[in-house]
Amino acid sequence: TLIKTSTGVWTVVYNAANRAVSFTSRNGNTIIECGYDYQGRRYMKKVTQNGTVASHERYLYRGYLQIASLDMLDNRNVLRTLLWDPLEPMATRPLALVQGASLYCYGVDFNKNVSEVFDAQGTIAAAYDYSPYGAVTGTGSLVQPVQWSGEMHDEELALVYYNYRYY
């Protein structure tokens, strides 16, 4: 299957459960592989560019909420941890992110879109605006994954991962 995103045209291969297991750029230089566990959660993403693995992440979950990402290229070091609102019935509102040695807090709108990310001093590290269908424009230098509808944004694909599908 071919899809077009703002980062290019991708060939997508699906497994028997209809989950995207690989994305290959039109020129073949970039390959993104995804693995899923028995509950259908994406447990890993590996990005290969020009034959070299550029990133390889493993994800840890509490239920269906991603709570941590591990760098498989760097001794399984923790890349980031996420804290979700425990008062939400489905706990889908992100509250905080620890990335590296830095703490960030999320500002969300009523649709659970991340609108701002604040650093520990209260300065806006990133701000986002969205179209009705999730196309994002952002400001700030912070690169972090939780954006539209409180879901994971894959920067390489410019798609949002909704636990079962990419949109």
Per-region residue spans from a language model:
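Extracellular/periplasmic catalytic domains that process cell-envelope and extracellular macromolecules
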Residues: 52-53, 60, 86-90, 99-100, ...
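Aromatic-rich beta-strand edge motifs centered on tyrosine
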Residues: 9-19, 32-41, 56-65, 79-92, ...
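A motif-centric feature for acidic-aromatic and gly/ser/thr-rich catalytic loops and repeats
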Residues: 10, 97-163
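Beta-turn initiation residues at beta-strand->coil junctions
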Residues: 2-8, 16, 22-28, 44-50, ...
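Short, solvent-exposed loop/turn segments that connect beta-strands within catalytic domains
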Residues: 26-29, 50-55, 73-77, 87-91, ...
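Pocket-edge structural micro-motifs
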Residues: 63, 70-71, 86, 99, ...
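Acidic/polar residues at beta-strand termini and the immediately following turn/coil
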Residues: 25, 37, 71-73, 85, ...
